[in-house]
Each structure stands twice: as C-alpha cells, then as structure tokens.
C-alpha cells in the first residue's frame, strides 16, 4: 500500500497482510451532553412510573401515555451506550471491503467484493446550522451511490478512509 497521509484523530490504521483496517472509536466529547440528557430522561420516567404504580388506583392513561417516551428513552440510552463502547472497523483488502461495528450491534455492517466498488466518494450531510457529518460512499456497477461508512464528525476522517479504500483497491477517483 502506498504511503498514507497523517492519520486523523479518532482513527487508527492497522496494517494487515493484504491491506489495512481503519478503526474508528465512537467515543467523543459530543456524547457527554446526550448522556446527561439520557440520565435525566430515564430518571424522570422511572420516577413517573414509580409514582403511578405505587398508588392503589392509577388511571390507565398515567401508565399508557408515557410508553412512547419509554421507547424514545430506550433508543437514546442505547445510542449513548453504543457511543461509549463501539468501534467500527473498515477492513480493506484487494478482495474487497468489510465494515463491522462492535461490541453492541449496529446497522451498516456489510461485506463488499472489490468488483462491486467502482468509485469511492465523500459526502457531507448538514443536519442544522452547527451540525454536519461526513459519509464515505461507494459507487456500484450501476453508478448508484451507496453508503459505506457514516457518522464521521471530521471530513479528514472520511477522506482518509476513502483514500485507504481507493489505494488498496486501486481505484482512481472521478470526484463526481
């Protein structure tokens, strides 16, 4: 594999016999406010149900109404836990690319053979004025863009992953 540029913060490059693994640790300072919010949200719901179910005659709506909020709380808490412990490995070899996230299950795990990938691109997604994420996309044989790795907070991380994939698979970017 040709010389790589500086490895961006939050990524590790692990050489293998036929390519490399780019490892991204999810943990970042952005997790802290959401973790605090999850604690407050979940504590409120525990308090709510504690109060509602400790009374002898609780109205049904007092138990049913917050069920949707419990679902949201479970989702936020799972995301926070995943953000604290998960890693994503992008294993690139001449034969193809495997993306795996662990230890908590997450979406976007995939294995692609090299002949399925014709180009690798970086896209920026803007969610609000101050919130953007970067996505590494690949173009398939039909030239349709598909997500390879998402949720990257720094463009340098996305560009680095894209470059490692391009170099290992010997793809020349068309920068569509």
Label the model's feature ranges.
Residues 2-18, 25-28, 82-84, 94-159, ...:
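Non-transmembrane, membrane-adjacent beta-strand/coil modules in membrane-associated proteins
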Residues 23-88, 174-176:
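Alpha-helical transmembrane spans
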Residues 90-92:
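Extended beta-sheet lipid-handling architectures
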Residues 39-41, 116-118, 164-166:
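Short, charged/polar low-complexity linear motifs in solvent-exposed/disordered segments
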Residues 162-176:
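Cytosol-/stroma-facing membrane-proximal "stalk/adaptor" domains immediately downstream
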Residues 57-59, 66, 135-142, 166:
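A general structural signal for short secondary-structure boundary/capping elements
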């Amino acid at each position: 594999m040709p010389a790589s540029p500086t490895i961006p913060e939050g990524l590790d490059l692990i050489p293998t016999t036929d390519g490399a693994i780019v490892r991204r640790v999810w943990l970042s300072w952005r997790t802290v406010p959401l973790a605090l919010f999850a604690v407050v949200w979940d504590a409120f719901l525990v308090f709510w149900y504690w109060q509602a179910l400790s009374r002898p005659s609780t109205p049904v709506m007092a138990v049913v109404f917050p069920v949707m909020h419990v679902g949201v709380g479970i989702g936020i808490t799972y995301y926070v836990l995943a953000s604290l412990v998960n890693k994503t490995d992008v294993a690139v070899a001449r034969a193809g690319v495997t993306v795996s996230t662990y230890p908590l299950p997450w979406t976007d795990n995939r294995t692609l053979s090299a002949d399925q990938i014709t180009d690798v691109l970086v896209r920026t997604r803007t969610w609000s004025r101050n919130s953007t994420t970067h996505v590494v996309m690949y173009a398939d044989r039909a030239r349709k863009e598909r997500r390879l790795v998402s949720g990257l907070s720094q463009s340098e991380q996305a560009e680095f992953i894209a470059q490692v994939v391009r170099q290992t698979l010997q793809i020349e970017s068309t920068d569509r």
